Amino acid sequence: MIQMQTNLDVADNSGARRVMCIKVLGGSKRKYASIGDIIVVSIKEAIPRGRVKKGDVMKAVVVRTAKDIRRADGSVIRFDTNAAVLIDNKKEPIGTRIFGPVPRELRAKNHMKIISLAPEVL
């Protein structure tokens, strides 16, 4: 459950380390984003010589949330941290690697490139 002002870790090698959500896309009154949703983020911390720099405004896909995700079979999945992957306007990841596990709910939201780059799909 990501809302405005939420800080997230970046789960790719785009050069950003931490980002802050500044908008949840998908409707004018939408308050919260969950896994697979697209948000607008501001880069708060970045490494030198990365593809992005501090202060850049980008779009990102939420890949991990600390809030539970309930599945159709009744199981629940949750992560320790909130994390996102930076994307471009064509919804392709900016980085070439994804760090950490991602849930298979991303497949239903058509983020296949992120699924294929991830080392583990839960």
From Swiss-Prot:
Cited PROSITE patterns: RIBOSOMAL_L14 (PS00049)
A GO BP entry: translation
The keyword Ribonucleoprotein appears for this protein: yes
Swiss-Prot/TrEMBL keywords: Ribonucleoprotein, Ribosomal protein, RNA-binding, rRNA-binding
Source domain of life: Bacteria
Any GO molecular function: structural constituent of ribosome
Xref: Gene3D superfamilies: Ribosomal protein L14
Similarity comment: family membership: Belongs to the universal ribosomal protein uL14 family.
Xref: HAMAP family: Ribosomal_uL14
Purpose: Binds to 23S rRNA. Forms part of two intersubunit bridges in the 70S ribosome.
Alphabetical list of NCBIfam families matching this protein: rplN_bact
Description of how the protein assembles with itself and partners: Part of the 50S ribosomal subunit. Forms a cluster with proteins L3 and L19. In the 70S ribosome, L14 and L19 interact and together make contacts with the 16S rRNA in bridges B5 and B8.
Name assigned to this protein: Large ribosomal subunit protein uL14
Record organism: Rhizobium meliloti (strain 1021)
Lineage summary: Bacteria, Pseudomonadati, Pseudomonadota, Alphaproteobacteria, Hyphomicrobiales
